[in-house]
């Protein structure tokens, strides 16, 4: 039997994003996309909100936006429980990260015919990085 802190309801899920002070939209498109993905994987979360964690209803996912300083882009997906925290954090230092990604996709698509999705690109280029390596 797991302690109550191990039950799914005891884990709080949230998204925190931080961008430079000049960024106008809040939350960013990336934060909205992350919220959509989290809600798909956690059906009891049916909407995201900018309300703080203290004001959340059970069906809401907290999204926090910070616009300050010179941080180009930072997104944290957090899962928090009374005795532990898990965070997945992505930060980009400049727009070069996105330019590099666009160039990689361009090289991948060069010479192909048809319409492609980022899922197809990821399946061919990123998924192999996570395959089990046998000793």
Describe the residue ranges of each PLM region.
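C-terminal substrate-binding/catalytic lobe of Rossmann-fold NAD(P)-dependent oxidoreductases
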Residues: 9-135
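Rossmann-fold NAD(P)-binding glycine/threonine-rich loop
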Residues: 1-7
């Amino acid at each position: 039997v797991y302690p109550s802190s191990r039950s799914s309801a005891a884990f709080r899920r949230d998204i925190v994003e931080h961008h430079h002070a000049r960024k106008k939209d809040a939350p960013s498109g990336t934060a909205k996309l992350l919220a959509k993905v989290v809600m798909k994987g956690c059906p009891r979360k049916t909407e995201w909100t900018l309300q703080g964690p203290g004001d959340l209803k059970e069906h809401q996912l907290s999204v926090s936006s910070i616009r300050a300083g010179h941080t180009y882009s930072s997104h944290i997906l957090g899962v928090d429980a009374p005795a532990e925290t898990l965070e997945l954090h992505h930060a980009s230092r400049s727009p070069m990260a996105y330019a590099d990604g666009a160039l990689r996709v361009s090289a991948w698509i060069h010479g192909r015919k048809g319409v492609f999705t980022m899922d197809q690109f990821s399946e061919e280029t990123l998924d192999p990085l996570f395959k089990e390596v046998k000793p």
